[in-house]
Amino acid sequence: VYVDEFVGHDMETRLTLENDFDRVYHLSADVPNSKGVGGSQLTTGRSNPIQTIQALDFAARNKSHFIYAVSAMIYNTEHQGHNGPDLNEQEHIWPANPAGNIYGMEKLYNMQLAKEYAKAYDMKISLPIFHAMYGPHCDILENSKVVAAMCVKIFNAEDPGEMEIWGDGTQLRSFCYI
């Protein structure tokens, strides 16, 4: 399998490819949001850790570098909305109190699990933490994240008119174009 080949697979079941892989990228997750898109809290809380365990097991068997996409939702709720470049794991995640829902908690759990796999299987891991992702393939009608939500507000605003911007003006945001 080459980097430009897509392998469709239900990640809740064991991946049985018989190839050497330098890297395993685990970049997606089922994300519940305010518009009911994706699974329920229970569905995502069950499904995402299972998928991560399957990906970690595969990477461990293949001695692959494991790259897991972590979400800014892992940060303690006191630091949500202030996700600038000064955030760090020890000061802003612990004590654990992820924002919003089970999604942040399971992302934090999966990140910690990857660290344990790295120790147990002598694996190399990378854990990039992404903030506010957006791009041409994001469906603004089905995504309640800040960029999509602001686009919907702009489209629905009267001309000329006003629209509400959330927050008190002190929040910092990091955006990731995908």
Q: Would you name each region that the model predicts?
A:
Residues 53-102:
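Conserved Rossmann-fold NAD(P)-dependent oxidoreductase catalytic core, especially the SDR/UDP-sugar
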Residues 8-49, 58, 76:
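NAD(P)H-binding glycine-rich loop region in Rossmannoid oxidoreductase-like domains
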